[in-house]
């Protein structure tokens, strides 16, 4: 861009927000982020600031950094800040602040507060023009969201920089750009990417980056790098990317670091990077310590692999060499190719070699098949050594020396991988293997392991060892002479003094020689070690036997050992005694050890065979005899021949050589094998195990012996454990510490598993005798006392061998010990309770152990009387002693534990028996004794005991055997006693369950305790709010009641009544949510036929008690419960229960009973009646009967109130429909209850009158009959409705009740279908006849009304089905003739009239047009009836105030109901026959509107119905006719007038345009009269409802206000109707009407009333103003009809003729508003036409001469709009001259005139701005004069108002011009 272009661009940017005209300023100001442009254009800065500052506060809550902008961009004085007049430095600082704000705003664009705060920067500082780059850059990450489009939308298109031109399309289309569009823009413009990256770099430096920005940058960069060509990458992208990545890596933001990793990984994949750059990047990545922390380690390693595998070179990294702590273990699990892993590992290996991790790194590299990488690694290793020959030796550098062993292992591995290549590389370094070995001080080619050496020695036993040994001695002598360092170790000083090393007491000497032996061998070359060992043996040990004990114990056996045996063999020495010790080695895990010992056994076998085979007897020396049996008094040995057989059986030992653990199987075969002699197996067993059991053997041998022997014991080999019992097992506990010391010396790490476990496994096993079992139990109990790990082993052994113990005593010993451990406070390594519960125990064990903890043994007690609790008077004193209490407490704890174990076993196995049950009952009694007399905590023990009792009884009950229980021990009274004494609900519930189970097992035991049980449950259990109590209660009842029933006792009913009485007595204490389920389960258990009615009655008794106490809440609870309770049963069960309840009511005495009478005794003995009933007085009995009936009715009513399938009524209907057989289950009960109700009704109506009981009986009767379905119901009530059978008042009352009930029943019926009625057509037809006959007879007013209502309801239901309508149409037509007579519609009683209308409505709804023949008999009489209601109302309103207050409600209530009924009938005819209602439509509308007693909502709905159903044109004519001809406007009810106007507006809205045009004349006539309504109403005075306030002067202003308000509201409705009508007309049809309206307003043409001109003009201008607001410029030209009239009005206002006239002031205000609207909406320069201008200009300006204060602002606005509207300069000058006249001192003007003129000029300057600055020379002199005006108000108005506005427009002070 040229210099000139740059300067022009800069100037353009700076002046972008400067507007030279009003339209441009408005356009700039209307650009908004949150407001519509039209709204934004009208806003001032104060409003925008308020919105923005609230948003800033929200942002400050999100980020406190926004607070700093409160004193700059969002300061209070920023409202008046204008950047266009500021200095360059101020503007620069402003831009920096705005850019900083947008930078900080980036993360929060999704919050609405962000845009609302940005609104201030856009609107006040034009940030959308001057700071648009930052707006776009910060919002660009949100390119897919609407907020980005909003930001683009406020940026002017011409201001968008060229770098963002690609966003213009998105701005034009208001559509978000896609990611592909963004990428294409960055791809095509490298400068854009550089620009955005620079912006991001600045964000990173300021720590203002955010997630969306980083995601956007990465998505663009990662796509851009692979898509760019090589030149672009190298020249542009890579430098930019690397700069940004470097900043990201130095940041502490984890997201930025990971973003840099992503970019660098992609970069390394698309472009080859130099080694120098790779090192630089690696340094940058690892520079921050967090790179290798847990959260970044994996990503860091992955990136490093990507970077260093991107190059083709294999080289050492300087950067990686500085990082020896790289977490290489991550590389193994990282998801990347193996080739890349190997390459990176090789580079890293080379970079840090040598180090601690070098060998680990090498093991991770796959070098096979990759010769290049192998050479690279070898080169690294050899280069690090740098060998130099110094003094004949070879050494390496210091670093290599530090890791000599590691390098040695690495070199060996490399040689093993590829020796040929390694040798090749050695040659290139001019090195040999020997030199390398010297450097590393180790052998490189010795690859044989120690085990292989051992095999080698074993395989070469036949070599000439004498020669080798001689050679070794000679060499050693030469070395000694040469002064070799080996001479420092002199074995001649070592001397073995012990006779054998198989005795543990010689352990110190053994360990000393072992150390010396190891040290000696380490000094000898590997090839000479065998000879060295022979030399050591020869020099140190006295004889070969001693040396063998040394090697056997140490576990070291070489070829030299075989050599010693072989050399010792002289044909006279037997070696077979050593066989048992040699066999121990076959348990060693090492196969080489096992192989070596196998060779040794084979050698001994060969020697033995050589000596004794084919020879009878030969005396030989037993090798090893003294060593093995040194301390043994008895030597168990075998003969040589038996030894040969044993060797033959053992065979080659190949299996043991190859597989570990085979020795035990071999020994089992030997011990159980069949030889020539039957006892040979046991002989071998004795021989081997006797030697193994020698107590002197050290721990290293013993641990293997015990391991093998324990395996044999587990295999079931008999007698194995006996060999070790006395020598090892029995004394083990005493010698354990000694064994531990030996194990520590022998470095046996895991003593628990290696030694102790094997030993304890020898304790017990199969084939135990009773005595052995006891011994085993005692030893294990002693082991449990050890407080060491031995406890764990002993516990495990107890678990495994417990079933094998043969005596009960031995089991009890163990159980007692475990219980003691639990009771004691000592620490135990295991949980004894788990062990106890896992042991299989039988009843004999439990009987024995329970006997041991029996309390009777510790505390003697007196004999117990059967079924009586023992006395505690003598024992409390004894229990008071502390030692006795402690002892009892101890035994209680033991008992609790044993009972817990018993409970577990009862659940697992069948161990229950009567003996155990007897003991448990004895314990139950003892626990009760301890709890009451000893005050001990027995609750838990009782609970566990109850569980044991329950399980035992259940098991006995379910067994196939019949058990005889001891009734003296197993007693229910003991359980009841514990129940009463226990305070624990859990114990009580479990004991109840025990009773329930005992009732099924032995019913006779619990029979005598039933009453106490029931009493307890009613007093305690039933009140508990938990599932367990509820379950226990139900199970107890379920088991006890059948037990009672099975006894065939005559008191069974009494027992049930007693049980239910006990339970219901606690009803209020039972949790409410458990009541229903509890009593339902109880009823089902007792059988509903036995208990439901009793329960209902007992709850009725409680209802009576609550009523007497006036406890309504409790009464309601009982009603609700019984309702829910009944729903849980089948319908026939419910009815049966209610029926039996009525029987109990019948049994209730009617009068007070005589004492000792028969019925007295009968009722007294029944728990449900008792003394409370038999001792009641007659009055009390009547109250109780009334309460019980009320209770029953409440229940039935509450049940039927819920219309669902669970109600009794619905279920009866379903049952009767399902099957006809159900009739016999349902109907008899209802008939029986109905008979009861009728009989009782007769008694308490006629015989013993009692109105309250009679009323309840009527309700009961109604409820019972209501239960039946409609069909059955009709059948049952018809005879009760026949007037011929209603002989007395009671029958009439019953008939009325049935009629009401029937109406309600039919009303609730969902529908009547033809199918459901046809079957019972005769019944329904008969019902119609009965009803019509009752209507005609007029027997009783209430009865006749009920019949009419019933008829109406049934008829309405018939209309649902077309078939029913046709079937009954003739009956319904006939009924209309009856209903329209004096017996119905023409009756003098309003109740009958209302009911008749209801019946007529139902018939018309059903038959419709078929009733047209009776139209004259219905509509005209109905309208007359309505007129009678208005006459009554009028008479009421004309009475005195006092009379109105007294009787208004009573007299008007019936009239109101009649009016509503009439309106209902009219609406019915409008629905069914709308076309036939047209003839009377005027009357109908008047009837609806004048029904003042009816609610407006009802009248409104009927009027809407007329508008919807009747021809709309006819409706419109009728509405106009009602107003103009029927003079409805004279109505005194404003609500009716409002309803009329609403209906008129709705009609007009629905009217078609064609009809509107045709009826325009009619409407104009109506409109003129409507406009005259104001004047008419004001002359008429207040409506009737306000007239009575006229005598109260203080209320009269309120009356006037209400009148004015209602008049204005109706006038507004007139305008709405008029405008709605005008909108349906065109210009051609409306102009004549408008001209007529103007003539009426001006001249009074077509005026009906004598209305003043001012009033007419008021009405007209009000209407015309609303028309202008709606149609705007469309009606501007209509002003031609009234320009002159308006001018005349203005002149009259200015002439002060009407000054002080309120109407004139109002008219003046409305005329000014009218002119202002016309000026505002003028778009065709209508008022610029000279004639119109002349006729309106001066009259308008003249208003300033006498304008009222209240309307001055309207004049100012009108003149201002007038000046703005006129376009020519001449017109403006005319206006200016006219205004100057009113402020000039050449003419006399009032101060008020000057002030309003000044305000007008101020408003003009504010609106016209610079356009009026040209008139400033004319105004300045006058302004100067006004500033010196005598009136201070004038001076202030000029100085504070006009001058400031002019200065703001002028841009400089006015003082210079004024001076």
Swiss-Prot record:
GO terms for biological process, alphabetical: maturation of SSU-rRNA from tricistronic rRNA transcript (SSU-rRNA, 5.8S rRNA, LSU-rRNA); positive regulation of transcription by RNA polymerase I
Top-level division of the source organism's lineage: Eukaryota
Keyword set, alphabetical order: Membrane, Nucleus, Repeat, Ribonucleoprotein, Ribosome biogenesis, rRNA processing, Transmembrane, Transmembrane helix
Function: Involved in nucleolar processing of pre-18S ribosomal RNA. Involved in ribosome biosynthesis.
Transmembrane helix recorded as keyword: yes
PANTHER family xrefs: BAP28, HEAT REPEAT-CONTAINING PROTEIN 1
The protein, known as: U3 small nucleolar RNA-associated protein 10
Organism: Lodderomyces elongisporus (strain ATCC 11503 / CBS 2605 / JCM 1781 / NBRC 1676 / NRRL YB-4239)
HEAT repeats: 578-616, 1819-1857
Signal sequence residues: none
Subunit structure: Component of the ribosomal small subunit (SSU) processome.
Membrane disposition: Multi-pass membrane protein
GO cellular component: a single term: membrane
GO MF: snoRNA binding
Keyword DNA-binding: no
Lineage of origin: Eukaryota, Fungi, Dikarya, Ascomycota, Saccharomycotina
């Amino acid at each position: 861009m040229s210099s000139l272009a740059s300067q022009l661009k800069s100037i353009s940017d700076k002046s972008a927000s400067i507007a030279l005209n009003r339209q441009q300023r408005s356009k700039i100001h209307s650009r908004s982020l949150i407001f519509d442009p039209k709204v934004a254009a009208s806003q001032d800065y104060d409003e925008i600031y308020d919105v923005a500052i609230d948003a800033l506060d929200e942002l400050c809550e999100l980020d406190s950094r926004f607070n700093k902008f409160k004193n700059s961009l969002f300061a209070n004085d920023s409202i008046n800040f204008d950047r266009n007049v500021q200095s360059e430095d101020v503007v620069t600082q402003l831009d920096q602040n705005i850019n900083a704000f947008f930078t900080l705003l980036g993360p929060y664009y999704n919050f609405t507060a962000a845009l609302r705060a940005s609104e201030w920067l856009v609107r006040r500082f034009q940030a959308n023009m001057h700071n648009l780059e930052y707006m776009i850059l910060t919002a660009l990450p949100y390119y897919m969201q609407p907020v980005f489009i909003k930001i683009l939308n406020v940026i002017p298109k011409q201001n968008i920089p060229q770098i963002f031109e690609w966003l213009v399309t998105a701005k034009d289309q208001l559509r978000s750009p896609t990611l592909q569009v963004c990428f294409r823009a960055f791809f095509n413009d490298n400068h854009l990417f550089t620009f955005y990256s620079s912006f991001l770099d600045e964000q990173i430096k300021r720590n203002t980056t955010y997630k969306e920005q980083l995601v956007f940058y990465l998505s663009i960069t990662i796509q851009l790098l692979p898509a760019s060509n090589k030149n672009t990458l190298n020249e542009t992208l890579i430098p930019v990317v690397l700069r940004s990545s470097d900043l990201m890596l130095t940041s502490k933001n984890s997201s930025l670091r990971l973003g840099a990793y992503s970019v660098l990984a992609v970069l390394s994949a698309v472009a080859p990077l130099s080694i120098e750059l790779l090192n630089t990047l690696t340094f940058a990545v690892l520079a921050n310590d967090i790179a290798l922390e847990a959260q970044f380690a994996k990503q860091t390693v992955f990136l490093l692999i990507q970077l260093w595998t991107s190059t083709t070179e294999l080289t050492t990294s300087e950067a990686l060499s500085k990082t020896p702590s790289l977490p290489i273990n991550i590389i193994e699990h990282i998801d990347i190719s193996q080739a890349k892993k190997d390459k990176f590992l090789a580079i890293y290996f080379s970079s840090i070699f040598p180090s601690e991790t070098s060998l680990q790194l090498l093991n991770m590299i796959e070098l096979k098949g990759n010769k290049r990488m192998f050479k690279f690694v070898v080169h690294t290793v050899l280069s690090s050594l740098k060998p130099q020959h110094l003094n004949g030796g070879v050494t390496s550098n210091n670093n290599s020396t530090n890791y000599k062993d590691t390098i040695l292992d690495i070199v060996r591995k490399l040689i093993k991988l590829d020796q040929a290549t390694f040798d090749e590389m050695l040659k290139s370094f001019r090195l040999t293997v020997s030199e390398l070995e010297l450097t590393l001080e180790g052998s490189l080619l010795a690859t044989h392991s120690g085990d292989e050496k051992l095999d080698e020695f074993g395989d070469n036993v036949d070599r000439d060892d004498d020669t080798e040994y001689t050679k070794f001695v000679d060499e050693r002598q030469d070395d000694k002479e040469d002064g070799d360092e080996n001479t420092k170790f002199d074995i001649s000083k070592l001397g073995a003094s012990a006779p054998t090393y198989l005795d543990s007491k010689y352990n110190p000497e053994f360990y000393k020689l072992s150390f010396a032996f190891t040290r000696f061998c380490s000094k000898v070359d590997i090839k000479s070690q065998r000879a060295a060992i022979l030399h050591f043996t020869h020099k140190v040990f006295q004889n070969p036997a001693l040396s063998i004990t040394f090697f056997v114990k140490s576990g070291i056996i070489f070829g030299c050992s075989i050599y010693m045996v072989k050399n010792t063999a002289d044909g006279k020495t037997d070696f077979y005694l050593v066989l048992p010790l040699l066999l121990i080695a076959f348990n060693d895990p090492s196969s080489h050890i096992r192989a070596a010992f196998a060779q040794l056994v084979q050698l001994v076998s060969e020697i033995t065979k050589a000596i004794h085979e084919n020879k009878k007897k030969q005396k030989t020396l037993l090798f090893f005899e003294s060593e093995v049996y040194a301390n043994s008094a008895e030597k168990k040995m075998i003969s040589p021949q038996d030894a040969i057989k044993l060797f033959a059986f053992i065979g080659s030992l190949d299996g043991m050589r190859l597989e570990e653990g085979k020795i035990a199987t071999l020994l089992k075969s030997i011990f159980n094998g069949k030889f020539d002699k039957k006892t040979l197996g046991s002989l071998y067993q004795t021989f081997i195990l006797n030697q193994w059991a020698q107590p002197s053997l050290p721990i290293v041998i013993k641990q293997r012996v015990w391991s093998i022997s324990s395996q044999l014991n587990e295999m079931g080999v008999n007698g194995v454990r006996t060999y070790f019992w006395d020598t090892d097992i029995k004394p083990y506990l005493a010698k354990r510490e000694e064994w531990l010391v030996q194990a520590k010396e022998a470095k046996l790490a895991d003593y628990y598993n290696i030694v102790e476990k094997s030993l304890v496994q020898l304790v017990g096993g199969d084939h135990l005798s009773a005595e052995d079992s006891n011994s085993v139990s005692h030893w294990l109990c002693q082991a449990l006392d050890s407080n060491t790990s031995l406890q764990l082993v002993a516990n495990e052994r107890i678990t495994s061998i417990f079933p094998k113990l043969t005596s009960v005593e031995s089991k009890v010993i163990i159980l007692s010990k475990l219980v003691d451990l639990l009771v004691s406070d000592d620490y135990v390594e295991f949980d004894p309770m788990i062990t106890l519960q896992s042991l299989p125990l039988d009843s004999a064990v439990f009987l024995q152990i329970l006997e041991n903890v029996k309390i009777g043994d510790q505390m003697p007690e007196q004999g117990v009387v059967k079924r009586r609790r023992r006395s505690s008077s003598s024992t409390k004193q004894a229990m008071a002693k502390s030692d006795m209490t402690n002892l009892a407490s101890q035994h209680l704890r033991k008992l609790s534990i044993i009972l817990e174990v018993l409970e577990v076993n009862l659940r697992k196995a069948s161990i229950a028996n009567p003996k155990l049950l007897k003991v448990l009952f004895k314990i139950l009694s003892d626990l009760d004794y301890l709890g009451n007399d000893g005050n001990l905590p027995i609750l838990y023990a009782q609970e566990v005991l109850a569980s044991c009792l329950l399980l035992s009884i259940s098991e006995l009950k379910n067994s196939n055997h019949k058990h005889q229980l001891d009734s003296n021990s197993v007693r229910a009274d003991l359980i009841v006693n514990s129940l009463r004494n226990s305070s624990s609900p859990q114990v009580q519930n479990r004991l109840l369950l025990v009773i329930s189970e005992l009732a099924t097992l032995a019913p006779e035991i619990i029979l005598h305790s039933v009453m106490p049980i029931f009493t307890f449950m009613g007093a305690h259990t039933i009140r508990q709010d938990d599932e367990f109590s509820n379950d226990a209660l139900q199970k107890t009842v379920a088991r006890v009641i059948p037990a009672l029933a099975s006894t065939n006792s005559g008191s069974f009913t009494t027992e049930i009544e007693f049980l239910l009485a006990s339970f219901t007595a606690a009803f209020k204490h039972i949790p409410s949510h458990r009541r229903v389920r509890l009593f339902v389960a109880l009823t089902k258990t007792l059988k509903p036929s036995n208990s439901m009615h009793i329960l209902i009655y007992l709850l009725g008794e409680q209802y009576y008690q609550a009523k007497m106490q006036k406890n309504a809440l409790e009464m309601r609870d009982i009603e609700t419960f019984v309702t829910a309770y009944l729903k849980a049963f089948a319908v026939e069960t419910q009815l049966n229960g209610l029926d039996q309840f009525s029987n109990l009511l019948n049994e209730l005495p009617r009068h007070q009973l005589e004492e000792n009478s028969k019925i007295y005794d009968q009722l007294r003995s029944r728990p449900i009646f008792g003394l409370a009933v038999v001792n009641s007085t007659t009055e009390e009995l009547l109250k109780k009967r009334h309460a019980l009936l009320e209770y029953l009715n409440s229940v039935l009513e509450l049940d039927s109130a819920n219309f669902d399938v669970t109600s009794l009524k619905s279920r009866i209907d379903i049952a009767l429909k399902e099957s006809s057989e159900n009739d016999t289950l349902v109907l008899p009960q209802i008939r029986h209850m109905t008979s009861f109700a009728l009989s009782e009704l007769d008694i308490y109506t006629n015989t013993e009158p009692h109105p309250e009981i009679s009323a309840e009986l009527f309700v009961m009767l109604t409820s019972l009959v209501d239960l039946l379905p409609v069909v059955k119901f009709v059948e049952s009530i018809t005879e009760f409705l026949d007037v011929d059978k209603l002989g007395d008042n009671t029958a009439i009352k019953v008939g009325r009740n049935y009629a009401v009930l029937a109406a309600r029943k039919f009303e609730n019926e969902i529908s009547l279908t033809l199918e459901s009625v046809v079957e019972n057509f005769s019944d329904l037809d008969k019902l119609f006849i009965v009803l019509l006959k009752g209507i005609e007879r007029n027997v009783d007013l209430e009865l006749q009304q009920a019949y009419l209502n019933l008829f109406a309801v049934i008829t309405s239901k018939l209309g649902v089905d077309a078939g029913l309508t046709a079937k009954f149409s003739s009956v319904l037509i006939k009924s209309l003739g009856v209903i329209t007579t004096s017996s119905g519609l023409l009756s003098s009683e309003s109740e009958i009239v209302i009911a008749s209308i209801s019946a007529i409505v139902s018939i018309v709804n059903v038959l419709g047009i078929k009733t047209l023949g009776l139209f004259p008999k219905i509509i005209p009489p109905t309208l007359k009836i309505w007129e009678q209601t208005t006459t009554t109302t009028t008479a009421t309103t004309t009475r005195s105030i006092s009379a109105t207050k007294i009787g208004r409600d009573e007299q008007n209530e019936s009239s109101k109901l009649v009016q509503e009924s009439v309106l209902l009938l009219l609406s019915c005819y409008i629905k069914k026959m709308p076309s036939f209602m047209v003839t009377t439509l005027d009357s109908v509308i008047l009837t609806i509107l004048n029904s003042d007693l009816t609610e407006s909502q009802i009248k409104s709905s009927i009027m809407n119905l007329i508008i919807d159903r009747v021809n709309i044109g006819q409706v419109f004519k009728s509405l106009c006719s009602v107003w103009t001809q029927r003079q409805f406007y004279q109505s005194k009810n404003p609500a009716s007038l409002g309803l009329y106007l609403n209906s008129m507006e709705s009609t007009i809205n629905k009217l078609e345009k064609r009809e509107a045009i045709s009826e325009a004349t009619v409407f104009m006539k109506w409109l003129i009269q409507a406009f005259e309504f104001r004047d008419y109403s004001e002359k008429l005075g207040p409506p009737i409802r306000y007239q009575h306030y006229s005598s109260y002067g203080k209320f009269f202003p309120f009356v006037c206000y209400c009148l004015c308000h209602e008049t204005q509201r109706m006038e507004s409705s007139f305008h709405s109707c008029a405008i709605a009508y005008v909108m349906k007309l065109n210009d051609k049809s409306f102009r004549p009407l408008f001209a007529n309206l103007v003539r009426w307003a001006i001249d009074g043409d077509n005026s009906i009333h004598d209305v003043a001109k001012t009033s007419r003009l008021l009405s007209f201008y009000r209407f015309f103003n609303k028309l202008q607001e709606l149609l705007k410029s469309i009606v501007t030209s209509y002003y031609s009809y009234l320009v002159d009239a308006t001018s005349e009005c203005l002149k009259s206002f200015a002439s002060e003729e009407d000054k002080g006239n309120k109407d004139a002031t109002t008219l003046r205000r409305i005329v000014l508003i009218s002119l202002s609207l016309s000026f505002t909406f003028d778009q065709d320069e209508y008022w610029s036409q000279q004639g119109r201008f002349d006729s309106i200009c001066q009259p308008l300006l003249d208003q300033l001469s006498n304008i009222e204060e209240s309307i001055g602002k309207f004049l100012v606005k009108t003149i201002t709009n007038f000046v703005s509207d006129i376009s020519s300069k001449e017109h403006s000058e005319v206006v200016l001259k006219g205004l100057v006249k009113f402020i000039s001192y050449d003419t006399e003007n009032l101060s008020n005139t000057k002030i309003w003129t000044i305000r007008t000029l101020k408003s003009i300057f504010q609106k016209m701005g610079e356009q009026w600055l040209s008139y400033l020379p004319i105004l300045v002199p006058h302004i100067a004069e006004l500033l010196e005006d005598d009136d201070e108000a004038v001076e202030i108005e000029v100085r504070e108002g006009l001058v400031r506005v002019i200065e703001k427009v002028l841009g400089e002070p006015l003082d210079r011009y004024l001076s």
